[in-house]
A protein has these predicted regions:
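Right-handed parallel beta-helix
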Residues: 281-292, 330, 350-364, 373-388, ...
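Bacterial N-terminal signal peptides that target proteins for export
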Residues: 1-7
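Extracellular beta-rich repeat passengers
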Residues: 126, 130-132, 296, 511, ...
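Hydrophobic h-region of N-terminal signal peptides that target proteins for export
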Residues: 11-19
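Short glycine/acidic-rich loop motifs that flank beta-strands on beta-rich extracellular proteins
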Residues: 64-65, 267, 294-300, 341, ...
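Extracellular polysaccharide-degrading/modifying enzymes targeting complex plant/algal/animal polysaccharides
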Residues: 25-348, 353, 399-410
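Extracellular beta-strand solenoid repeats
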Residues: 54, 61, 67, 76-78, ...
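The right-handed parallel beta-helix/beta-solenoid scaffold, focusing on the short coil/turn
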Residues: 49-51, 58, 64, 73-75, ...
Length: 584
């Protein structure tokens, strides 16, 4: 046996009675899993009640998700500086072909490796696309829902008309859709573009959000990606999945003989997974860096989101509209949604904490507390360079639950309750799925989102609530306080620094600072942005003492008992100064 394949497990007896144990781990295959197993044995055989796994510096490369189970309750995983839990695979052996470098893609777990992201020396490279400046994106000309066809300028698609795996990323009000191109037919100065199933059917059936065709020049913009014909700029790459070759044009200063080129291979790096009756309890992650998680669903099924990155699995328009109770708008659409993957996922767990961790270089969500969770915290963490949302809290409804309906599960334990999200830096997230959010919460109770700084997001800073109706549901007692949100709405409008949906009794939004919104020229409505935005069904929410440069707010189809008080530039400087991360 190769001794280097065995993790170094140094067991230090902290008590003669065996109450506490330290397990020190160095990087090796399955090192973390073996340490967790060792900790279980210390509890089973020696009665240890307090076990710490210490990750020494280095990269812990995974073959699959690390699963933290109920048997691991009470474990503290603490990382030394430089300890990285990685789902990445390194690409080496680059050879120059003109201005392009090419390398073989290794197999992963005995299968061809496909990926949608690539990083060079920790900097995300661009999947080959037709424009480097998004302000120069082409716009669609018309939509034929019956034939599931988009008509676009012929010049936009001339390069990729014979490409087999090209994709269109289509700007649709508050979401972007990833549509795999099936066919391009050019006639004159126009081209008909069709798409693969299942996303084509879903995309052309659902009414909201929809591709825009207007009379004022704000037709939906789009860009094209994933075709070798588009590979022409430094920092761009293309994967030929069939040949298992990857092509890259280096940026200035990059030496491909020494560069660390990483692609993601594991979808969820760590899954904390209990059961409703036997939750994982009292687990802490401290100082751990989680990097290079993948999410391949858009390459398999496309991606047609409803909102906040939640992709539709079925959707269609209602004719006539459904009359709803309690003064809600008539409902003109139906939709069922799935949830994007997260690099770290927590389900059925009590008091799981992430302290001073880093979530970076991932395809989708950074960290989520999904369902059957109680307590727990995400504190003093950094979330950056993520394709999707930074943090997601709570369920957005099971996949069988229609998204516009109130959600009141008979087993209330399913609701994410008592989570604290405090003093985190969330920046450069949503850099791939522009419709995602900095921090997003679905059906939650007793949630605290306080003293975070959120910047460089494509859409909304903090989105809280779900359901588009004012009927009583499982949301209540949430707090959004003293957050600093700036440089948001980088790509999407119908947005706000802080946005709410649904009835949330005893919920407070207070003492936040929202400023510095982007002005993308391709937004569907250049005036439809806000600092604070209570959307459909928002009810029983107190919005007070929030500093914004002006009072540009929207209250759309709200329910009863909302209170707005003292918001705007007149808010006291002392309140304004308290927003954002509190120094230790």
């Amino acid at each position: 046996m190769n001794k280097r394949m065995i993790p170094t497990l140094v067991l230090a007896l902290a008590s003669m009675c065996g109450w506490a144990k330290d397990i020190v781990v160095s990087p090796a295959p399955y090192a973390i899993e073996q340490a967790l197993q060792q900790a279980r044995e210390e509890r089973r055989l020696n009665g240890a009640t307090d076990v710490t796994i210490r990750l020494q510096a280095g990269t812990y490369r995974l073959y699959q998700s690390v699963v933290v189970r109920p048997e691991d309750s009470g474990t503290h995983i603490i990382a030394d500086k430089g300890a990285v839990v990685s789902g990445g695979v390194r690409i080496t052996g680059w050879k120059k072909q003109g201005k392009v470098y090419v390398a073989d893609v290794p197999e992963f777990n005995g299968r061809p490796l496909e990926f949608r992201q690539l990083w060079v020396n920790g900097v995300k490279a661009d999947r080959a696309r037709d424009v480097s400046d998004f302000e120069k994106m082409y716009r669609i000309r018309s939509v034929d829902k019956k034939t599931e066809t988009l008509y676009v300028p012929a010049a936009a698609v001339k390069k990729i008309q014979n490409a087999k795996h090209a994709e269109m990323v289509l700007h649709e009000m508050w979401c972007v859709a990833n549509l795999r191109i099936k066919g391009v037919k050019i006639k004159g100065d126009s081209a008909a573009v069709t798409f693969h199933q299942p996303e084509s059917h879903i995309h052309f059936m659902h009414p909201w959000p929809s591709p825009m065709v207007t009379t004022d020049g704000h037709n939906s913009a789009f860009y094209l990606t994933n075709a070798k014909e588009l590979l022409d700029q430094p920092g761009e790459w293309y994967l030929d999945a069939k040949a298992q070759k990857v092509y890259y044009i280096p940026r200035n200063g990059e030496n491909m003989s020494t560069a660390d080129v990483e692609v993601p291979a594991v979808e969820t790096l760590v899954s904390v997974e209990g059961t409703p009756d036997n939750p994982v309890t009292g687990v802490t992650f401290e100082g751990v860096t989680f990097s290079y998680a993948t999410w391949m669903r858009p390459s398999i099924s496309g991606h047609a989101p409803l909102q906040a990155g939640m992709y539709m699995t079925e959707a269609y328009k209602l004719r006539p509209k459904t009359v709803r109770p309690n003064g809600d708008h008539k409902l003109d659409n139906q939709g069922w949604v799935g949830r994007p993957a997260a690099a770290v996922s927590v389900n059925a767990a009590t008091n799981v904490d992430f302290l001073k961790c880093t979530f970076e270089h991932c395809a989708s969500t950074g960290v989520e507390f999904h369902q059957y969770t109680k307590g727990g915290s995400i504190k003093r963490c950094t979330l950056s360079d993520l394709g999707g949302s930074g943090i997601l809290a709570g369920s957005f409804g099971p996949e069988a639950h229609e998204a516009h309906q109130p959600y009141n599960p008979s087993d209330a334990r399913i609701i994410c309750t008592g989570l604290s999200i405090e003093n985190n830096l969330v920046t450069d997230v949503t850099n791939e799925d522009w419709g995602c959010v900095g921090i997003g919460a679905g059906f939650v109770r007793d949630l605290r989102i306080v003293h975070n700084e959120i910047s460089e997001v494509s859409y909304t800073g903090i989105s809280m609530g779900w359901g588009w109706n004012q009927q009583a549901c499982s949301m209540a007692n949430n707090l959004v306080q003293s957050n600093l949100i700036h440089h948001y709405a980088k790509h999407m409008y119908d947005t706000a620094g802080i946005y709410t949906l649904g009835s949330q009794p005893h919920t407070t939004i207070e003492g936040n600072v929202v400023r510095d919104i982007y002005s993308p020229g391709y937004a569907h409505d250049p005036n439809h942005w806000f600092y604070l935005y209570t959307d459909e069904g928002s009810s029983c929410i107190s919005v007070k003492n929030n500093w914004t440069p002006t009072d540009k707010y929207l209250k759309n189809a709200n329910g009863p008992c909302n209170v707005w008080d003292n918001n705007g530039p007149e808010v006291a400087d002392s309140i304004k100064a308290q927003a954002g991360i509190v120094k230790e």
